[in-house]
Amino acid sequence: MEIIKENNENDGENINNIPKKKSGSKRQLSFKKKWKASFKKNDFVNSHGINYNKSVGVGGNSGMPQRRNSIVAKPIGLTSYKINHNHNYQSQKLTWKYTSPTNSSLNLKNSDLKYLNNENKNISDNSNFDDGEEDDTDNKKNINNKNNNNNNPLTDIINIEEKIANTTTTTTNTTTINTETKNDIDTTISKLNNFYDNDETNNNIQNETDGNNNNSFSISNNLIIKEKNNNNNKNDNGDSDDDEDCKIIILDKPHIENLNDKNKQILSQPHTLTQPLTPTSNNTHKSTLFKKLELPPAPPSPPQPPVFQNLNNCDNIIQHQLENNCDAKNKSINIYNNEFDFKNNNNNIIENNENFEKNLNLLNNNNNFYHNNNLKKSKDNILKKSNNNINNINNININNNNNNNKKSKSKIKIFKKLLNNNIDRLNKNNMDNVLMKSQIIQINGAEIDDGNNYFNKNDQQHIEDNLMFLNETSQTNNATCEIDNLIDSIKINLSNGYFIAGQKVTGNLEISLNQDIKTSGLNLKWKVFEHVIINHYQSPQSPQKLNKKDKEKEKEKEKENDNDNENNNSESLIRDQSFELIDASSLKSFSNSSNCGSSLRNSQSINLNNYNFNNYKGGTLKKNSKIFNVLKNSSSITNFLKINPLTSSSSDFSLNSSSNYNLNLFNENRLIYKNQEKKTIYESGDSIFQTDDNGGIMNSGLHIIPFSFLLPSHLPSSFSDFTIDKETNEKILSAIIYKLSISFQDILYEEEDNDENNNNNFYNQHDDNEDNENIRNKKEYLKSLYELLKDYKIKKSFTVCEPSIIAAKVNEIPIRMEKKKSFLVNSGQISLKVALKRTIFFANEKIPINIKIENASSRSIDYILISIKKIQNISLSLIKKSKNNNEKQQQQIEKDNDEQQPNITDLTLSPSSSSFLSNSSNTSSSKNNNNNNNNLIFKKCTFKTSQRFNGVDAHCNFSDTILFDTNEIKGFNQTTNGTLIKCHYNIVIQCFVKRAFNVVCRIPILFGALPENNLTSIFNDEYQLNLLNM
């Protein structure tokens, strides 16, 4: 026999947690065997855990007197569970298990245990109990009477306990019992069976046949019942096996529940009874005895409702979801940690590179000390360490690239999408600017004539052309980022930076390729072009009060102008696409007047296509937007705007705006009139490299390709000038630029079979383990690179001077000039003689001037002024209107334009743009040609610098060599003779005489640029900066 140790977990709960009932309340318990038992709160027990005298009402505070010769078993400190019965009660054999105070339990098998006093066999079903309490002495008497009864099996059980405590040998988990104690146990079991049989016959218990009634009860016993399954554990004779498994029913709640179909109420709440053990002199280690209850077999578990089944399924699903979420989070954390480690590695690589560069810079700065052996050794050590670092970095990068190939390919697609989205956004912004113009036109929709509908059609053409220009420029900018994958470096080297017209230009091309490229060769093109831009600013006049006579005169002029506009022939000069506008400062005074429209028709006009809302040097965006909003929101805008019929389809471009329109500008209440012309003087091209010998493939690696071409002798010198006239509010840009460009010839991409011979080509190179999708993506990407290579060009500018400049420098031909002046009133004259050793000079050079003055008159010369004057002649062509010749003119314009793709430094032409040139300080003349063109020659004269010297008295002479310093001149341009631009220089010597005309001598000279390599792109750089200033 084994004693099983069991720990009571709920021994510490308070008995006061039992719900209270009123004093005097009674509760009667009944179950199938007609047992009656009552229990009282705060009941104390002996060392065996049993009180035979007192009784406690379940759920109540008051005690109830118990019937004589009744035995009530009250165990200690365990809660109870309720047991439901839904079948007829039948006598059956039960196995009892009781727990000792030493946390050990005894299993009594092969018997039905029953302890009841012989005097307590007949208990009536309807016995009543009165409230009240009994003394402790009565309890002791009852206990002694029951213990003295030899026929009572309780005494035998107690004796067995003492024997077990004295004779058993305990191990860690089990105890062994002697054979004597086993025999005693068997005898007590037989006695208990006899009592059990007698009890059934004497009490005449009537078993109920209705098995559907449900009786639930709970007894506050520290009782653990093993109940065997009747269906599965019976032998052939009907007896149950003792060694097979049993159901365990634990009764550990200190309250009783009786639930019937009529009233289903829970009479008490779960709690525990904790009672301290009371040791006695006789029995120090006595185990707790349990009252035997004859219980029916446990019913089969009822089927679980579908609701609870679903809840269980939901719980399982939620658990799986939580586990999946935890796994996903762990995976994301691991990925994040890997990315963080990768970033740290990259940062370490960058820091190593920076340290390496710093070390090299330190060594390069100490070139004077490299002769020492110690420094050489240190340099070698540093270089070795740096090489090791570079090798380590390369290994790390290779590993990272191998791990992240798939990610990089996906990123390439993402970057392409982002680029396309940016292009779409730029197009939308440009369309917004166009819509602003269309809103102005729609305001006057009621007054627009048929000629204005022609304006809308032309505007659509301008918009489409400009959007094409924007897309092409964005593609060229993005191409440089992607072409780096094919081309490592490319550079054009010229033998000199300064060439003379009629001389050969020599140089070479250095190009290193990362991959093989299938091309037929390389082409070289060079050209010379002239570009002229004139911007005229005119501040609008504020409105003045007019007399009646002036108003009448203005009305007559308006009528004449209206008649002239109606009678204009088709051969009239093309006008700007413009609308009439007044100053925004006068809007308040004229906004409510009704006749202001007629009085403003002769106001100055502005080019609507050249209207710009972007920032400019002369003004700010806020001012411009305010003026535009006032015009747009004014109720009488039809009185301020008048759309003129448009006859041209050209548009201008500028670099001061992010959009593809040149849209200029309210700048500090100024209107801009712009005219520009661009012309190609000479261009040629030839192939410098061919790949016929190599099967049409240019292999990867470094290639050095020499080239040369001849410059014609009649070409003008390089030139770049930018001037601002404050008096006339004009900005003039003029430039003559030489450029060469090299591009690939006949780029082809053809997919070939993946043979062993062709696998060396870059478009067939791939790993054997690579997926088909990756190979397709790679080929598509290479196709896009090939398309970019077709338009890819590398450009370089160079400087050219006219042969006359070099000839004058070599020959040094002197020049002399003499001027004489006489006076009407005074006798005598003044003679001025000037001599120069040579006529060619360069910037920042002192010019020696030999001057002789003979003053034979009675007048004195106050002072002598020497200055350098620049004379610049600009010719512009105005194309006449002719509907039949529009297509021919456009073809001629396309020929004059650059054949290259649009570049940042190249501006598109405005073939039919008019000009507004002031005649206040400049002279202009027009010449008619047979091609229906009107050439306008504009002469611009500016003084670069001047110096003042002492004068000569009357009847005196002066002879000396004066050194004229040119250091004060910020920049000189070469003397040039182009088709649109001509620039010359004169040295002007003036003798100032009071109350008389001055004696003036003008000597033409030549200015050139120094032949240095640094001047290869100086004119092109100035040209680009001047474009931004325009």
From Swiss-Prot:
Pfam family, one: Arrestin_C
Acidic residues: compositionally biased ranges: 128-137
Top-level division of the source organism's lineage: Eukaryota
Low complexity bias: start-end ranges: 142-152, 910-931
GO terms classed as biological process: protein transport
Chain intervals with Basic and acidic residues compositional bias: 547-562
Keyword Metal-binding found: no
This protein's UniProt keywords: Coiled coil
PANTHER family: ARRESTIN DOMAIN CONTAINING PROTEIN (PTHR11188), ARRESTIN DOMAIN-CONTAINING PROTEIN F (PTHR11188:SF129)
One GO cellular component, as annotated: cytoplasm
InterPro entries tied to this protein: Arrestin-like_C (IPR014752), Arrestin_C-like (IPR011022), Arrestin_domain-protein (IPR050357), Ig_E-set (IPR014756)
Alphabetical list of SMART domains matching this protein: Arrestin_C
Coiled-coil ranges from the UniProt annotation: 320-374, 544-577
Protein name: Arrestin domain-containing protein F
Lineage: Eukaryota, Amoebozoa, Evosea, Eumycetozoa, Dictyostelia
Disordered: annotated segments: 1-27, 119-154, 539-572, 885-931
Family stated for the protein in its record: Belongs to the arrestin family.
Gene: adcF
Keyword hit for Coiled coil: yes
